[in-house]
Structures are given as structure tokens and as C-alpha cells.
């Protein structure tokens, strides 16, 4: 799986870009503010319909333009070429296409281009809210279990209706029972999907971590979001009065968590900044490995400002793992030589260089 061509129009300071990346290593250099991160951002938007820098769509559209357009030609692992594209205007209206036909949702587009991002925000995986870690888990579940996303969407709809019902002055017991039954079924299915994926993920991560950083006593704990000793139906019944008082469903798979601890304590509170970065890199690489093992496909890695995020020794470890995964990578940095340094001991790899200056992308000889 690789991105064979990328065309970007009117995204931030990228007015018009048309490149043909290498199927392996792509190194993007340029001064801060030149647009190199925006190039990675364009790939992420093409893959997921959203930016890794902002949840708002308007800042993505170039000044005085009506919309941005991103087109990609994906080379699948079976050598088939799949054209995909996204356009979003100032009003937020979006047009999605794959293989020349309109696509109904971002989820339908996302299956064509699985990407992993490693940047400064990635380290929120440890420090951020449980939602960040749920999203991390669910990336893998989404890509390996195709029934997950429809079930997840149904769960969100069910929670919305149940919470609305809880806020009424008078609650119809039959209506509550109907929503509770559906919620129980969906919640248990979502939990099953996550539990199965984490059972695959954890041993791969634990083995991989030793090559990044030795952290004796580090553990991952998948927590399903309600008392593991109780059936979810019983939990809903027991917590009804509190849920009604506060107008929200407290327990369930929407409150699941991936706890990362060191000797029983929150790892984010104990580890140094450098150790945290290495831990997160191991999490991201392990996720790509499990994805490949289960699906037989490979994901694309977008690594922003690598020289600034890791010291030379640990930067080399990440580069070595990206090399071993035999997948497509896009890595940005300010200095050309600093980016190239990690690949000098790999003569069979010839990185493709891209220089970004004032939103213009060139491919120097």
C-alpha cells in the first residue's frame, strides 16, 4: 500500500502541488513555515477527512479560495491503482470520491489509505484524555474489524437518544427499556472487538518496546468502561438514578480506557519526556505491525519534524524500524542532511527528496 501520486490545491499555503512520491522513503525539508507539515497534513486529510492540526475546516482553505481539493492515486498491495479524492468548501460541504464514484462517508474513504502520524501532538497519547487513547485503539479496530464502525455509529446514536430521555421530567419505562436493550447489545459488541484487538496488540508492543527503551514494570491495561465483575445490563440498572440526575450515561464502552502504567502508576507522571516519546513511537510502530499481520496490508507513516522530536540515537532506532517494516514513509525536517543521515547505512534505499519553499514543492536532483 503506497501513495503513488498526490495533487493538492488551495490547502493552507499549498496553492498547487503535484508530486509522485517514492513507494518507500520520502524526505521533505524546508524552513519552518514553508509548508512541509501542510504536505503531510494533506495526506492525512485525504486519508481521514480531517487534519491532525485542527478540527476546523476553514483554516485549511487557502486565503481567498472557496475550497481545497486533494487527489491521490493509491497503489494497492495487489498492484491495483485506486484514485481517491476529497474536496471541502468554506461551508463545510464535502465531496468524496474513490475509483471515479462518489463515496458516502469518510469511513468509506479511510479504508483505502491507512496512515499513522508521529508528531508533537502524538505524545498526547500518554498525557491526554481517555478519548485520545480510545481513538488510538479504535484506529486498529476500525481497520481490522469491518463491522466495528457501523456498530460504533449505532452506539453513538443510541447514547444520544438515551441521554436525551434521561433529561426528561417524566421517563417512559418502556422507551428506556428499548434503548437500554440496544445499548447493551452494541456496547458488548464494541467491547468484544476492542478486547480481541488489544489481545493481538499488547504482546507485539511489549516485545517491540524493548528495542526502543527498557522500562521494567510498564503495562498496558485495557479497561472496558464498566465494572468487569458485572453485566452491563445490571450496571445500567444500578446507575440509573445517578444517570438521571446528571442527564448522561456514565458507564459503557464510550468510557473505555487504555491505561499505561509503570509499576502501577500513571506512566505519564513518571517517565521523562524522552522516555515518553520513545514509548509513543513504540505504540505507533506496534500498531502498524499488527495491522499488517492481520490484514496483509501496510500503512503509511507520516513523521513530522523528526530531528526536533528525538535525539540522534533514538531517531536512528525509529528510522531502522520504519526501514524494517518495508512501508512507505514521509518524514519532514528543516535540514536536508539531518534527514538523510538516518538512511546512509541502507544503500539499497534511495530516499526521494522534496524541498518545500513558500508553499512550492520541488524535487531536487
From Swiss-Prot:
Claim: DNA damage is one of the keywords in the record: yes
Compartment(s) of residence: Cytoplasm
Gene Ontology molecular-function annotations: ATP binding; single-stranded DNA binding
Keywords linked to the UniProt accession: ATP-binding, Cytoplasm, DNA damage, DNA repair, DNA replication, DNA-binding, Nucleotide-binding, SOS response
Keyword DNA damage set for record: yes
Highest taxon of the lineage: Bacteria
UniProt organism field: Cellvibrio japonicus (strain Ueda107) (Pseudomonas fluorescens subsp. cellulosa)
GO (cellular component) term, any one: cytoplasm
Positions with a binding annotation for ATP: 30-37
A biological-process GO annotation: DNA synthesis involved in DNA repair
HAMAP family the UniProt entry points to: RecF
Family per record: Belongs to the RecF family.
Protein's recorded name: DNA replication and repair protein RecF
Ranges that cross the membrane: none
NCBIfam families for the chain: recf (TIGR00611)
Role this protein plays: The RecF protein is involved in DNA metabolism; it is required for DNA replication and normal SOS inducibility. RecF binds preferentially to single-stranded, linear DNA. It also seems to bind ATP.
PANTHER family from the UniProt entry: DNA REPLICATION AND REPAIR PROTEIN RECF
Amino acid at each position: 500500500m503506497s501513495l503513488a501520486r498526490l495533487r493538492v490545491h488551495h490547502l493552507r499555503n499549498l496553492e498547487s502541488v503535484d508530486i509522485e512520491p517514492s513507494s518507500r522513503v520520502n524526505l521533505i525539508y524546508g524552513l519552518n513555515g514553508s509548508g512541509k507539515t501542510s504536505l503531510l497534513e494533506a495526506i492525512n486529510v485525504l486519508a481521514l477527512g480531517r487534519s491532525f492540526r485542527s478540527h476546523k475546516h476553514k483554516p485549511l482553505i487557502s486565503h481567498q479560495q472557496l475550497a481545497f481539493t486533494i487527489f491521490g492515486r493509491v497503489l494497492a498491495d495487489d498492484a491495483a491503482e485506486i484514485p481517491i479524492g476529497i474536496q471541502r468548501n468554506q461551508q463545510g460541504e464535502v465531496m468524496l470520491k474513490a475509483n471515479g464514484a462518489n463515496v458516502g462517508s469518510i469511513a468509506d474513504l479511510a479504508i483505502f489509505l491507512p496512515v499513522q502520524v508521529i508528531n508533537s501532538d502524538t505524545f498526547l497519547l500518554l498525557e491526554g484524555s481517555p478519548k485520545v487513547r480510545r481513538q488510538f485503539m479504535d484506529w486498529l479496530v476500525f481497520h481490522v474489524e469491518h463491522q466495528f464502525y457501523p456498530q460504533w455509529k449505532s452506539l453513538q446514536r443510541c447514547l444520544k437518544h438515551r441521554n436525551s430521555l434521561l433529561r426528561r421530567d417524566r421517563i417512559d419505562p418502556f422507551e428506556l427499556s428499548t434503548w437500554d436493550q440496544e445499548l447493551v447489545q452494541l456496547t458488548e459488541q464494541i467491547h468484544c472487538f476492542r478486547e480481541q484487538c488489544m489481545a493481538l496488540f499488547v504482546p507485539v508492543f511489549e516485545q517491540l518496546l524493548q528495542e526502543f527503551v527498557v522500562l521494567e514494570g510498564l503495562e498496558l491495561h485495557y479497561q472496558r468502561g464498566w465494572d468487569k465483575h458485572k453485566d452491563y445490563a445490571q450496571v445500567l440498572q444500578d446507575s440509573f438514578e445517578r444517570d438521571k440526575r446528571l442527564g448522561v450515561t456514565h458507564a459503557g464502552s464510550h468510557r473505555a480506557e487504555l491505561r499505561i502504567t509503570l509499576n502501577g502508576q500513571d506512566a505519564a507522571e513518571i517517565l521523562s519526556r524522552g522516555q515518553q516519546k520513545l514509548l509513543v513511537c513504540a505504540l505507533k510502530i506496534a500498531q502498524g505491525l499488527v495491522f499488517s499481520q492481520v490484514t496483509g496490508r501496510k500503512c503509511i507513516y507520516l513523521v513530522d519534524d523528526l530531528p526536533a522530536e528525538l535525539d540522534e540515537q533514538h531517531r536512528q532506532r525509529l528510522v531502522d524500524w520504519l526501514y524494517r517494516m518495508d512501508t512507505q514513509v514521509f518524514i519532514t525536517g528543516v535540514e536536508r542532511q539531518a534527514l538523510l543521515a538516518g538512511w546512509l547505512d541502507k544503500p539499497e534505499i534511495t530516499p526521494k527528496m522534496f524541498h518545500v519553499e513558500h508553499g512550492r514543492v520541488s524535487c531536487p536532483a
